[in-house]
């Protein structure tokens, strides 16, 4: 696995990633443990009953590319094509409400990328 890989943008945009099974676990947790009436209390005007699901952890696209590169054993170079758009520079979910309700993600990005690659190779 040599050569080079051209990726769009600068690699500087920041994103949040969540393992799919963590998403499913959080969804079930919310359905089984949260009474949305308790979130709005006695005030019928409160409409902020949503709960963001995420890891609350950030990584740059360049960091993710390096993690993937390491997981798959790519020995080549990554080149960033800054003539292509980066998109929104930062996307992070506020998961403070979810954490206060007792749920936290289990799989870190650093562990999930190699696990996903291993699964891919086995299937």
Which residues does each PLM region occupy?
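C-terminal substrate-binding subdomain of Rossmann-fold SDR/epimerase-dehydratase oxidoreductases
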Residues: 1-123
